[in-house]
Amino acid sequence: MFLMNAPPVVALQSRWEAFGQPRSFCLPDCFSEAKEDGSRASVSARVQMLISTLQRDEAALGMGHERLTQRGQRAERSRDTRLAPKPAVCKEQPEFPARGLVANCSALEKDEAGRRSPLELDSDSDDSVDRDIEEAIQEYLKARGGASEPMSQGAPSIPEPAHSSTLPIPCPSQLTPGSGSVPVGASEDQGSTSPASMSSEDSFEQSIRAEIEQFLNEKRQHENPKCDGFVDKKSDPNNSPARLRGNRETSARAALMGTCKEFIFRKPPRLTKMSTQQRNFQPKPTTEPETPVSTKLTAHRPEAAQSRGGVRRSMPARRSKRIRSSAPVHQASDSSSDDGIEEAIQLYQLEKTRKEASGDPPLRGQLKEESPGSAQPNALPEAHRRPPSKKKLAVPKVIDTTQGVLHPDPLSRLLTDSRASLPPGHAAAKSEAVCQASRLADTSTELMCAEAILDISKTILPAPMEGSDRPPSRNPLFCPQPMPPRSEGDSSNIDSDDSIEQEIRTFLALKAQVGSPQPAQGPLSSPGPSGQPGIPKVPFAKTLDLPLVCKRKRRGGGGSTTMPKKIREGRESTQDADHIQGKAQPGHDGWDPLGHNKITETPGGEAEAKEQPVISRTVGLSDTHLPQGALGKATEKESSEDKSSSLDSDEDLDMAIKDLLRSKRKFKKRCRDPRASCKKVRFGSTETRCGEKPSNLPGDWKDHRQQALRSCLPKCRGDNKDGPGRSPGSSVAEKAKMGGTGGEDATPAFLLRRKSPEGALPSTDTGASGHPPSASSPTSEDSAVDSDDSIELEIRRFLAEKAKESIRNTEPQGGPAKPEMPCRKDPTLGLQPGVCTRSQKARGTPQLAEGRRGPERARTQATGLLSQSGKGTLRAEQTARLTTALGRSEPALPKNTCRNSSAKASPPSRKSAHVHKDHSPQGSQTATAESVFGQLPSCAKVGAEAGSAGGTFHLNYGSQNLLTPNPGSQADLVLPWSDFAHQSRLSSPWVLNSGQGTVWTGVFRGEKEKGATSQAGAPPSLSSGPRKGLPFLSTQLFHFGKNVSWGGKQTSLFSPNLGLPLQAPAFSAFRETQPGHNPVFGSPHLLMKDSGNWPSRKAQGTLRQQDRRNSASEDKVLDLRYRHRVDREPQDQETLGSDASEFSDTSMEDGGSATVSSKGLKL
């Protein structure tokens, strides 16, 4: 298209002439300025033509609608005239280079003009003529803006400024009294600068000026009402970009027009306060004086220059221009888009006339322009709108006060009306159809604007955070209303770009209206606050988004539910922070931010979000009322993210995630503190309790679980949605706390927080039933809110039933009661009443928790389950994946699945024995030391107590990485805990004590240590030292799924992603070495971990199973406090060999708990 380097004489000339007449392309040609002489002559003729056309236009524009028609006529006439004098026009075009408009118009250009003469001439001449006309119109608008701006601002101007704030950028156009002058100013800038470069054409410019002045004078008289809404907008979308480029070139008027330029051109990144304000204020007076001269001077040259530089972009710009019927004048500058421009102008004029007739010319005109060109005007206007939000947020005093005061309600009404009333459906449809094409470009701009607005709202809105609860509830109320008009009218256009911006605006406007209609509108800048200035703009986009999002959320959870996920996250984080300390759910609430954050980020998070409001209510709406600003900010962010999730959601999510992570960290500390404050079960004290409650645990656990389940299930219903992502930790923490381990729960919950995405929800026995469902559904179905909700409900029911079963089972035997279900492990979970197994995986994992306390167990189990359900496959059933529990949920309660259950037959006796306090004190203390796993140690204790629960394994380790396999690994890892459990030592729950913060960093070396006598009471328990001993069943081998890092011995048996519980038979090595005692595995191996984490064993953690002989008191839980390294023969290691590697795999995978080296379990 650009024959920049083509020789002056091109054979294509004649061909192009034939094709040129269609004027389908404005070809910016860069040619040598060889034929400027003839072009100047043609320029004078062209000037005469322009004058005549301008005069005609003046007459027509004076008529009102004729202006639009004449625009097309002018374009046509200019085209016709140019087409007729193509040679002259070619000369003119070469002259343009001389003038600086077409610096490269040369003989080649002439030739091309001859070839493409219609095209070339049309493009340049059309552009210049159209742009001259446009500039004249703009100048007129400036003058009119100066004179009629007070009028339009007085009556229409309020809507207009409101528009500029709400529908903002139309705002440039609606600001056209100020902002309208901006496009004019922009063109003037070009004019002012262009004249400098075109100084050679003074006479031409002067003639143009005279014509333009006359024309503008007439237009000012006739088009004061029309041009404001019409020309301003049109000028803004089209002229703004094209002339902004010119403006960029021109530094003159930088103060006034520079601001306008920035506003128009930079509006996506930063529609600065100055740009809006200056546009609104300075451009009016300054632009008008400048307009007649500089615009006229510039009229052709800047337009020609733009026709070159701008025409190239005008190819895309034409689309936007056409799409933006709002820019018909500027579109006219694009010769190829003249027809479309004419049509758009006519339609726009009709619309404008209707608007004027309706009394809302500026508002409706702009609204309609936005709605018809919603995508493009939105791209540009919305880019403006969003920055105006920023501007309003930042400088709400000037603009927002004038624009935003009346706007929130009128804006929503106008937006609705404009969307609904868009009488020029053809224009709207046309612009919408084209907008879809321009939206692609606009989307990026709008996204940038939305991001900037979100950032600004983040910084600015925090002030109004206190009213956050209110705006969310209002939002739901208002969202549906604004949403139908916007969604219906602009569904196609708004969906990607407008929806975000409009919904934000709607949300802000609604928030402003509902919160403090007047303050939100005028003071929106201050109280509604900084975010509120943009409310007029943002609220509608927000409302649109909120209707979609809020509807889902409202259905899931109440007024606060309507709050965007991130808002809820931030609010809940605050709530969690506040409540974590003050409530039994500190960990739970603390988890809400994290798990909820993750979920919030994902569609599935909405399920959480739904319930999170419930939690917020539970936690306290005082937190929910995080500053309106926070909600508005979060809501704005969230709603925009919801629709622009693919666009700017990543950035917003990153920011939100970072914020949430920060809050989570704070919550972690807070949760730890609440754990400390909530002595529910301090691990130090829990240690003893574990021993003390061995036999009592079942009853107590049952009671706690039942209570916790009752309390947690309702909360889970409210929280599960929060919990889905965060429930693993939050549910466990909450439930455990409710069960009395609340203080400790925060740690598992915190640990789970990182696991929560995995959906390891089957955490606590008590709350397991409720939370696992939520965890499983959100984790597995983050993207499906509905499915999450239904799944969560189903899972909750199932878990509730299962918890009851578990309680029953746990009551009788604490674990061995149901060995029949190896995979389901639910009966085994019975051992751990809180087996909130995800529907499939984490059935039995919670058993472990039983041992401690209902709550504590619940937390431990929840942690274990969470870790296991990290993939949402809670192999809890396969509690066999102790490794998952170890790696993932510190409470590595493998809840010996079926086998655990079967093994539990003997364990019942051991239960009490294991439960003996030995392991718990140290392990619990260590766990307590580890804030995150503090609860886990108690779980370990619980596990000891849970000895009754049936050889459940309690991983107590302060550090999360203790045997924390990847969520997936955990899910995949299904260890034949039942097999391990079958072994008497399995019956005794082994507590993984990393309580001192020692993590199973090294390897689980399943070393058959026949001399594991040091572990007097618990042969099955791992003792690598007080901290080092892992309470693994001697026979249990943990394959953590994918990574077989332990000792590098990974049995194919446990393929990284086996995902199915390893059963005793699966552990061939284990079975090989089964001693007489161990049905599944040979001599019981003391799983010991030499890990730097374990105080006594800072070396690699090794899983060592004590000999059955050594573990003479298999019934007794290994005294983790006195975890002794039990040296066993390598035989056992060999036996566990490959399986051990699997175990190490998962724990290695766990990332956080991956401290476990990829050393294979050596049993």
Curated annotation (Swiss-Prot):
Composition bias type Polar residues, residue spans: 163-179, 189-201, 273-297, 860-871, 1133-1146, 1154-1163
Gene Ontology cellular-component annotations: nucleolus
Composition bias type Acidic residues, residue spans: 783-792
Biased composition, class Low complexity, residue ranges: 515-535, 766-780, 901-910
Gene Ontology MF annotations: protein phosphatase inhibitor activity
Major location (coarse): nucleus
Protein function: Inhibits phosphatase activity of protein phosphatase 1 (PP1) complexes. May positively regulate cell proliferation.
Subunit structure: Interacts with UTP20 and PPP1CA.
Protein name, per record: Protein phosphatase 1 regulatory subunit 26
Species: Mus musculus (Mouse)
Taxonomic lineage: Eukaryota, Metazoa, Chordata, Craniata, Vertebrata
